[in-house]
């Protein structure tokens, strides 16, 4: 049914962007249940502190180790499946800044997973949209590693326009800034 829905949407000029979450799982922290990745190889799939606790840049108790080759392959295979089998037009990545952290949680200059997705032969024409921040304080709006392929989800646009449309006072100036390209966040060049 979903494949048919996407075909019909596309036939009517509507693109389908799939919201994906590759930053955490439902397994929680070290006290959480073992559904899948903890059982496969906890040390590969999750970012762990030297003491064996889970980093929590997602606010959900754990963080996937997205730049490990095994996890990188898993993410790429999942996205390729949705692109080939379902023909989605792109992906919006929840808390995408997590995908730019190394196994110790440090931000990387050229994260392998983000670069791999940007240049993947199957995903090459797909829209890639990053929610360019995470719950650990890494805020990359305006500076997300993109290789001229990644777009950024503008959360301030969402928040300011919502306030404006609700009729909140004092937000007209912010709404104008958002409508005209968020020059306070992005280099106009």
Predicted regions and their residues:
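Substrate-binding/active-site clefts of carbohydrate-active enzymes
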Residues: 1-87, 92-119, 138, 185
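Conserved alpha/beta catalytic core and glycan-binding cleft of carbohydrate-active enzymes
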Residues: 87, 103-104, 108-189
């Amino acid at each position: 049914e979903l494949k048919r829905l996407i075909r019909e949407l596309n036939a009517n000029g509507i693109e389908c962007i799939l919201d994906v979450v590759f930053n955490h799982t439902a397994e929680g922290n070290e006290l959480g249940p073992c559904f899948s990745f903890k059982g496969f190889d906890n040390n590969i799939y999750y970012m762990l502190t030297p003491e064996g606790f889970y980093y929590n840049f997602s606010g959900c108790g754990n963080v996937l180790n997205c730049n490990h080759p095994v996890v990188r392959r898993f993410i790429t295979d999942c996205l390729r499946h949705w692109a080939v089998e379902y023909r989605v037009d792109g992906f919006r990545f929840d808390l995408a800044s997590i995908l730019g952290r190394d196994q110790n949680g440090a931000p990387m200059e050229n994260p392998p997973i983000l670069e791999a997705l940007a240049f993947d032969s199957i995903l090459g024409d797909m829209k890639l949209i990053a929610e360019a921040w995470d719950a650990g304080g890494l805020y990359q709006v305006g500076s997300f590693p993109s290789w001229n392929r990644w777009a950024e989800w503008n959360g301030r646009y969402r928040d300011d326009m919502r306030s404006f449309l609700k009729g909140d006072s004092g937000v007209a100036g912010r709404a104008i800034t958002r409508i005209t390209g968020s020059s306070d966040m992005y280099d106009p060049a």
